[in-house]
């Protein structure tokens, strides 16, 4: 089975070491452009752009990088409860048209109540997934060309519609990750690709089977992806030295402070990530070549595949055998590691080819929209 491999744009910072300013570098537009162009040139299918208060805005970053890339797809965040589904659908269609079908969307419910409250969202975990399900229903239908009336518990819209469709038909694919039962129910019912963070193959197998069964019960099929860091070198010994070097400047206080901050999250996925290492620097190889060191201070994806090219490819195949077809990778620093992954890992993988859709016109040739409602129809010639 061919696999899709994405890279990552580190809009929240980058460097040679975790939890330290030593070896850090400025993440400005020029640097992000270098990473995006490298990923585009090296054969990555797309890039994940993170979201949250610690990051640059993912939509603006993606839009700014469209003109300087050719085939690279951009996986950007949808934030239910923070933006209306109708506006989000219009923005999604615009990004898809401007990029000629290179837009992908990642539904992010959020897991930090403190950050969400700062955004004006004061729902608990259960309520957030209710709101996310309603948001996604409206967003999908509007993008697919329907006029939507919807009266839910959290979302109410009347006459929601889109005048200019996206390039991808019927709409751009929707990605989503979440480990709770509510998240898996949402994935089974509404998304195209379910993402998991890099847990052990046994844990991932359990998740895949649960979501697959729930989707089948609704008459649907769902694709699967995984989010991992990668530390690949010419030898496995060298890769492990690089992994240990990445956390060489971490002290116990920095780790404890990070874990205390993560403890306030109500994200089941974050809780599962934290359980892999227990906040300790020893015994970080939790499965063959799967290292939990990144999660000592980084929220979200906290594990890395470590080894030489053939070894890492073998571990990737183990996940692929479970049904994973999309791998979203990253590495520190992200520019250099994109090249290492391309040179040392790609030759051992069966990579899918990126296909772009036929472009639709961004606006109709018949003229300007009338009264902000009607697209003029072409008059037939007799």
Curated annotation (Swiss-Prot):
Q: CDD domains, alphabetically?
A: Alkanesulfonate_monoxygenase
Pfam families, sorted: Bac_luciferase (PF00296)
| GO BP term, example | alkanesulfonate catabolic process
Q: List the disulfide bonds.
A: none
Q: Which reaction does it catalyse?
A: an alkanesulfonate + FMNH2 + O2 = an aldehyde + FMN + sulfite + H2O + 2 H(+)
In short, the EC number is 1.14.14.5
Instruction: Kindly report, in one word, the top-level EC class recorded for this enzyme.
Output: oxidoreductase
In the record, what terms sit under GO molecular function? alkanesulfonate monooxygenase activity
InterPro entries annotated for this entry?
Answer: Alkanesulphonate_mOase_FMN-dep, Luciferase-like_dom, Luciferase-like_sf, SsuD_RutA_monooxygenase
Q: Does the keyword Oxidoreductase apply?
A: yes
Q: Which UniProt keywords apply?
A: Flavoprotein, FMN, Monooxygenase, Oxidoreductase
Q: Enumerate the NCBIfam families for this protein.
A: alk_sulf_monoox, PRK00719.1
Function per UniProt: Catalyzes the desulfonation of aliphatic sulfonates.
Q: What more does the entry say?
A: FMNH(2) which is absolutely required for this enzymatic reaction, is provided by SsuE.
By sequence similarity, the record places it as follows: Belongs to the SsuD family.
Subunit-structure text: Homotetramer.
Q: This chain belongs to which protein, by name?
A: Alkanesulfonate monooxygenase
Q: What's the source species for this entry?
A: Yersinia pseudotuberculosis serotype O:1b (strain IP 31758)
